[in-house]
From Swiss-Prot:
This is Fe/S biogenesis protein NfuA. NCBIfam families: YhgI_GntY (TIGR03341). [4Fe-4S] cluster binds at C152, C155. SUPFAM superfamilies: Fe-S cluster assembly (FSCA) domain-like, HesB-like domain. It comes from Pseudomonas putida (strain GB-1). The lineage of its organism: Bacteria, Pseudomonadati, Pseudomonadota, Gammaproteobacteria, Pseudomonadales. GO terms for biological process: iron-sulfur cluster assembly; protein maturation.
């Protein structure tokens, strides 16, 4: 299985859970909600026969079939499902390091590319000040409408960050973008960094 690894311990644990469902042919379905965003969540659910989606990738395992959601497959690359025993019994863990990483290229829609650079280049720097910026919209004239949050909302340096950091980076990476506009209410200063 190239996209995801299910350890023997996880397989045995899941097989035991599935056997208790009294449903012949039941398997699991692995998917990511909101893949490629900061809100991505990796999920495993029971999958009764007929509940799999036509475009799912079926992976036959020793005791059951795992169905991988087609949209989620690129985000499941290098994912690991494991089961570790502890004093309380044990815990199934899912580690999907690429779940929140947007998958974009130069042919991707402009909003996906903007979000990609915001998440991978801009927000990691803003996080050191407890802040973040998000895309609200791309208006017809090629302007990205952004909103600051956290420590950036109300910060006295937001204009400098917007023009010297964010706009410069986005214009270098996305040639058809014409500029950025801030719609943040900066009168709210209780969490401002500066």
């Amino acid at each position: 299985m190239s996209a995801i690894t299910i350890t023997d311990a996880a397989h045995d644990y899941l097989a035991d859970l599935l056997s208790k469902q009294n449903t012949p042919g039941i398997g699991i379905r692995i998917f990511i909600t909101q893949p490629g965003t900061q809100y991505a969540e990796t999920c495993i659910a029971y999958c009764k026969p007929g509940e799999e989606k036509p475009d799912d990738t079926a992976v036959g395992l020793k005791s059951f079939t795992a169905y991988l959601d087609a949209v989620s497959v690129p985000f499941l690359e290098d994912a690991l499902v494991d089961y570790a025993t502890d004093r309380m019994g044990g815990q199934l863990t899912i580690k999907a390091p690429n779940a929140k990483v947007p998958m974009v290229n130069e042919d991707s829609p402009i909003n996906e590319r903007i979000n990609y650079y915001l998440q991978t280049e801009i927000n990691p720097g803003l996080a050191s000040h407890g802040g973040q910026v998000s895309l609200v919209d791309v208006v017809d004239d090629g302007i990205a409408v952004l909103q600051f949050g956290g420590g950036c909302q109300g910060c006295g340096q937001a204009d400098v960050t917007l023009k010297e950091g964010i706009e410069r980076t986005l214009l270098e990476r996305i040639p058809e973008l014409k500029g950025v506009r801030d719609v943040t209410d900066h009168t709210q200063k209780e969490n401002a960094y500066y």
